[in-house]
UniProtKB/Swiss-Prot annotation:
Organism lineage: Bacteria, Pseudomonadati, Pseudomonadota, Gammaproteobacteria, Oceanospirillales
Reactions listed under catalytic activity: an N-acyl-L-alpha-aminoacyl-tRNA + H2O = an N-acyl-L-amino acid + a tRNA + H(+)
Signal peptide coordinates: none
Encoding gene, per UniProt annotation: pth
Name listed for the protein in its UniProt record: Peptidyl-tRNA hydrolase
InterPro entries hit by this protein: Pept_tRNA_hydro, Pept_tRNA_hydro_CS, Pept_tRNA_hydro_sf
Organism annotation: Hahella chejuensis (strain KCTC 2396)
Annotated catalytic residues: 23 (proton acceptor)
Binding sites annotated in the UniProt record for tRNA: 18, 69, 71, 117
Length: 195
């Protein structure tokens, strides 16, 4: 059951070598949100990440990009949860998703990590709690399991970046519904969207 969102975490790896990779799709959406609101993510040592606060539908929403590497994202999310007293169920985690086409969007509440190391570490740091919302940003599958690592760590092609950016603008349209926890309409629209 979706709850109101009080924070959005965009997963990715830090540094310029990873900035435009498929694995950083969540971080790219977070940067898009901050820019749209005239804000910038700034380093915050206590949160082990880059942080800013924006307003959506009159609500303060915390944005966090963990500056730990992907497989240590949980430490940063736990720091955010503890410092701002936000339950995990109110933190939307945006991440790249291999199993859906580039530019495709899926909202999901709860479930396993599906092999995603960022999700795996968040679940671990919260004592096995899997009950949190996810924004799954499609990056497509390379078609061969042996190519997955090079695919997710590879730079996003111009065509796929255009698809992701179209998806980000589609998300903008439904962000208030997502933030308020009213996912039914947002899911119907987002899940039928194709960039």
């Amino acid at each position: 059951m979706a709850k109101p969102v009080r924070a959005i975490v965009g997963l990715g790896n830090p540094g310029p070598d990873y900035a435009q990779t498929r694995h950083n799709a969540g971080a790219l959406w977070l940067e898009h949100l901050a820019r749209k609101k005239g804000q910038f993510l700034r380093p915050d040592k206590k949160l082990h990440g880059d942080y800013c606060k924006i307003s959506i539908a009159g609500e303060d929403i915390h944005l966090l990009f963990p500056s730990t590497f992907m497989n240590r994202s949980g430490q940063s999310v736990l720091s955010l949860s503890q410092f701002y007293k936000i339950e995990l169920e109110n933190i939307l985690v945006a991440h790249d998703e291999l199993d859906i086409d580039a530019g495709t969007l899926r909202l999901k509440f709860g479930g396993g990590h599906g092999g995603h190391n960022g999700l795996r570490d968040i679940i671990r740091c919260f004592g096995g709690n899997k009950d949190f919302p996810r924004m799954r940003l499609g990056i497509g599958h390379p078609g061969d399991k042996s190519k997955v690592t090079s695919h997710v760590l590879g730079r996003i092609s111009k065509e796929d970046m255009d698809k992701l950016e179209s998806a980000f603008y589609q998300l903008d349209t439904h962000l208030e519904a997502i933030i308020s926890g009213q996912w039914d309409t947002a899911m119907n629209r987002l899940h039928s969207f194709r960039a």
